[in-house]
Each structure stands twice: as C-alpha cells, then as structure tokens.
Amino acid sequence: MNNLYLGVDIGSVSINIVAIDEENELVFKLYTRNSGNPIELVKEGLAKLREEIELENYKISGVGVTGSGRQLIAYVLGADTVKNEITAHARASTYYHPEAGTIFEIGGQDSKLIIVEDGIAVDFAMNTVCAAGTGSFLDHQAERLGVPIEEFGGLALEADRDVRIAGRCTVFAESDMISKQQYGFTKPEIINGLSEALVRNYMNNLVRNRVLEGEYIFQGGVAANIGIKAAFEEEIGAEVIVPEHHDVMGAIGIAMLAKRDVKRSGQESSFRGFDLTEQEFETTSFECEDCANNCEVIKVIADSKVIAVTGDRCGKWTASLIGDSAANANVEGSSEKEEKTAAKSSKKQDEDLNKNSEELEANLYKVDLEKEKQVMKELEELEKSDENKKEDNSLV
C-alpha cells in the first residue's frame, strides 16, 4: 500500500487541497473558491479525492493544514502538522526551486514577501490591511470592466501607452481608473497601468529597503496574471518564475512538512479518516467572563460531541473536555474516552500552533538590538535637551 500525505490551505478566498506521494509527486490537486463554509468545502474536497484515486491502493499517512483558517480545519481533520503560510510557501518554493531567494506571494486578501537563505525563510513581510493588489480586488475590477479574469493579465500586455494609476488604496485606484476611462484611455492601457501600480504598491509596502537576491518566485492565485508578472519583471529588472502549481504551493508545502513530521515522530497519523465526510460539524462560541481577558471560546461539535475547544488563553475550557461537563453543556452522548481523545488532539493542536508561532518569531524576525538601544539613547538625549531648554527659558 502506498502512502499519501494531504496538504490543506484554508485561505479567505480559496481552499486548496493536495495529496502527494513519498516522492513528493502531486497525486491530487483541488483549487476551489471559499464560499464561506470551509468545513463543507473540505468535506467535498475529500469526497472528490476519494472518487479520483483508488483508495484501496493508498493510505493517508499524514495531514498538514495551513492558511488563515487552519485552526478550525486542523481540529476537524485531525491534522498532524499545523503551520503558518510563510513556512508552507517557503517549503514548496525551495523544493521546486532550490536557488529561490525571493518569494512574491499574492493571494485573495493579502500579499506576502518571503526572503530565503539556504532554503530557509529568514525574513518576511505581510500586507493584510489594504486589499489593493490582491486577488479579490483584481476580480472586482475585472468584473467592473467587463473583462473575464482569465483575460485580465493578457490585455495588459496589449497596451500601446503607459497610463499611471494610483495604487496605494483600492478606493483611489478604482476612482483613478474610472477617471482614465472617461478621458478615453483603452481597457488594455488602464489594466496595464493598474498592474504597474499594484506592483509599485507591493514594493513600497513590503520590500521597502530589503535587498532582493536569488531566483525570484511568484506564487499565489494572482501569479496566473501575466500582466502582474510582467510588471514585477520590469520593476526589479530580472526574470520572475511562476511555478507550475503556483496556486496550491501552500498546500503542497504543508503536505511536505506533514510527511517530514510524521516520519520523525514514528507515530501513526491523527487523520480522522474519510468517514468525516459523512459527519455533521457545528461551531458555537461564547464569551468567558471568568477573568478580564473575556476570551471568545469556540467549540467544534461533531455528531453531538465536542471534538475541540479553542480560543481560551488559559486553557481552562480546553482542559474541561476531560471528565468535565462544562465543555459539553448542551451536548449529549459524549463518552469519557471520546472526550479524552478529543482533548488530547485539541491540546496537541494548540501546542503545535504555539510552537509554530514561537518558531516564526525566532526564525523570521531579526531584531537589531543595538539599533534599538541607539534609538532609545537618542530619545533620552532629546528629552534631556528639551528639559535644558525649558530651564534656560525659565531663567530668562
């Protein structure tokens, strides 16, 4: 029986599911829009996986989950590895392109810059505040212009003139595009101007004064837009590589990491199995008022049983899964054995998430302490200078 490893990337706009074998060959790939119910979409994705491959010849030996919605889906699937998108994207990029030094990643709602040295992510930047330049913004503009999103990038290359579009804000960008339309500029010229503006915005907000080296990799859903790719190449003066599976690189990376972690541990996968496609899942929440934190505690319920509790900073409600009816209030039929199993899984996921956060901070953030001390020193000198001025003025 052959081993398969699942990778699931839960984004705000898309949900990606892949399966790789022992040689990291892609056996299954699914890219689907997130319509607002990630649990149901993941269940549908697993059902498609079961339909497309002969499961009697394969065994799911590891499951990894990444993306902004990773916590909930990790509990639902029984994931072995849960990591942030930066780590997952860097893993896949450096596997396919060992010389990768700079990774541009633009998704549906955010954009990322990842700096890689010797196959390891050493620095990164994310823009989660402004939607300008993200996939959802481009979708909206394509719809407004009456252009299929698949043709959006190609039209940019047909522009005869350069048109400057404001790209720092979605509101200003759209207003400027409308203004340029009224002045008679063509759709290709406006789309090309928008592409260049969004790349300028990316460079100003994320790259800033960072030194970009190595191969330049462009991934995420927006990487399919050849207009944006061309704008990046013009901006940096170098070739930009778009991987074959640019749209699911996060899922591929987390699948690879899950395979690594399972082999290191020597334990069986925690995957709940394909039967979960037949289960009904429900999420409920309440505000804990036992301390000043007022945590929003989220419970995940499957077939009338609490399988996970998250959101409590102190771990009180997570721990209450073991032999305590508090977590299972309003839930009937939870056996002690099942509660202990769920609590163990929930605790493991929380530990993994905390560990991942610590690793991210330790490995990706390089805090220049000497510079910080210098800034503090300058502030102290400035304060002393102000005090001396006040004293001099009082003597006059």
Where are these regions (language model features)?
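Gly/Thr-rich phosphate-binding beta-strand-loop-beta motif of the actin/hexokinase/Hsp70
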Residues: 2-23, 100-116, 291, 296-300
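Short glycine-rich, Thr/Ser-proximal phosphate-binding strand/loop in the N-terminal lobe
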Residues: 4-47, 124, 128-129
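Short beta-strand-loop/turn "lid" adjacent to the catalytic site in phosphate-handling enzymes
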Residues: 30-35, 53-86, 122-123
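Glycine-rich phosphate-binding loops at beta-strand->alpha-helix junctions
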Residues: 66-69, 197, 208-235, 243-250
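Acidic, glycine/GT-rich loop-and beta-edge segments that sit at the periphery of enzyme/chaperone cores
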Residues: 260-331, 335, 350-357
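Glycine-rich phosphate-binding loop plus the immediately following alpha-helix
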Residues: 35-39, 118-161, 169, 260, ...
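Glycine-rich phosphate-binding/hydrolytic loop that grips phosphoryl groups
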Residues: 91, 135-139, 244-271
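Adenine-nucleotide phosphate-binding core of ATP-dependent small-molecule kinases
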Residues: 175-204
